[in-house]
């Protein structure tokens, strides 16, 4: 087991234990493990099921790492995801952990922010086949297909006498 130098948002792993990745650390690179996605509704009001995470967790591997979702140009990549783990030890807390490798010589400021803890959060982007609305079940392939509930994502509605928040179920 090579040493992981930094963990992004270790507080956000809850009671879950970060995995032990097997990898060969290269000189001059920073290795960062992070919780990439959980089987819950996230702060962007997107939800991923445990089944979807189990099906797709390996698709993180060999994907580029970007800053602030600047992912249109591969030249803006700041690293690569070299491994991933699916965690289902606690059925109430299913999640995917990733291991990122970043070149400290090429991106010294970014790596220093991670090392110092100044940068301690991350966001995950993905491509979806479609999403469904948590309120009405509308299936959307593009933003043009969104129902009013998703257009006002995060709003609350009374459904069968219960208050329910609108979010996207990602598929």
Description of each model-found segment:
Residues 1-171:
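Signature of dsDNA virion morphogenesis modules
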């Amino acid at each position: 087991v090579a040493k992981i130098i930094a963990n992004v948002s270790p507080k956000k792993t809850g009671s879950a234990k970060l995995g032990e990745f097997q990898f060969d650390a290269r000189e001059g690179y920073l290795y960062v493990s992070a919780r990439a996605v959980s089987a819950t509704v996230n702060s962007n009001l997107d939800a991923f099921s445990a089944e979807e995470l189990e099906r797709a967790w390996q698709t993180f591997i060999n994907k580029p790492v970007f800053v602030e979702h600047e992912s249109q140009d591969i030249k803006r990549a700041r690293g690569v995801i070299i491994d991933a783990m699916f965690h289902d030890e606690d059925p109430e807390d299913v999640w995917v952990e990733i291991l990122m490798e970043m070149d400290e010589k090429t991106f010294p400021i970014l790596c220093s922010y991670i090392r110092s803890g100044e940068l301690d959060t991350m966001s995950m982007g993905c491509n979806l086949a479609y999403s469904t609305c948590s309120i009405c079940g509308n299936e959307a392939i593009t933003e043009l297909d969104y129902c009013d509930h998703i257009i006002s994502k995060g709003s609350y509605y009374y459904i069968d006498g219960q208050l329910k928040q609108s979010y996207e179920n990602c598929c």
